[in-house]
Amino acid sequence: MRMLPQDLHDYDDVAENYDLYLDAMYSNEDNHAGFQDFYLDFAKEYGKDGVIDIACGTGAVLLYLAEHGIYADGTDLSEAMCRVAEEKAKAKGFNLSIFPANMTEFKSARKYSCAIIARSGFMHLLTPELQRAALLNIRENLSDGGMLTFNTFDPHPFFQAQQMNTKDTDYSFRLEYTNKQGQREKIYNAISYNPYTQIMSGNWKFETLDDNGVIIEERIRPVKMRQTYRQEMKYLLEMTGYEIVNIYGGYHKESGECSAKNVIWCVRKK
């Protein structure tokens, strides 16, 4: 099933702490405020014949939907993430179908009227060929007129220039949080950018601290994501049989006409 090298989200330690450090991250960054309600509204509007949460991670959207009466299927490339999501679902009393699969090739026994790729899930497809394969495969799993939503962001020349001169060991502090074991951890990022492949690659460094602030463990986890320009995304959607219904600049349905940290695509199977 796995076609890509091991990534940040494949590691057990990342999966078990994913919700904890994202909570800390989102409390300091406003570009994800309201993301669960956006997907709940999307599922309510388009999910009458079934919803699938692709790249579901540990279930932030999947379980939020279930808590509001929408029982979606969930899939993720990371077996570790699926395992955590399933444990959380069972703890809440939900019997959901959650399975590890590659979005470029998964097959479901049913069709869905609504597919969700939340947050950065689509951006982990590292080539146009993989993006095309995913869009075509998702289309095959959608019913006629089915809807898909996914995110990109508008590449910024200033940050691209910075990252073109950054090595994967040039770490900068990102956040501090308390891990599952109750220990303080600091996270550092080092991201470089290749303008020819449009891929951001680098490492996340996790430092675990004791009660005196002394580092007692350090873990390096790799990560890669691809930047996609709107023009190429529009062409790719046209080639793969989708029509664009809306493009938003944020989870509160801000105008998508200006440059945005979150470009949220809402597209329909033609």
Model-derived regions, located:
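Conserved class I S-adenosyl-L-methionine
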Residues: 1-55
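Class I SAM-dependent methyltransferase SAM/SAH-binding core
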Residues: 59-105
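A conserved beta-strand element that flanks and buttresses the S-adenosyl-L-methionine
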Residues: 116-118
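A short glycine-rich, Lys/Arg-flanked "PGG" loop and its adjoining helix->strand segment in the class I
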Residues: 132-144
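SAM-dependent methyltransferase
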Residues: 150-234
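C-terminal lobe and adjacent flexible extensions of AdoMet/dcAdoMet transferase-like proteins
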Residues: 224-270
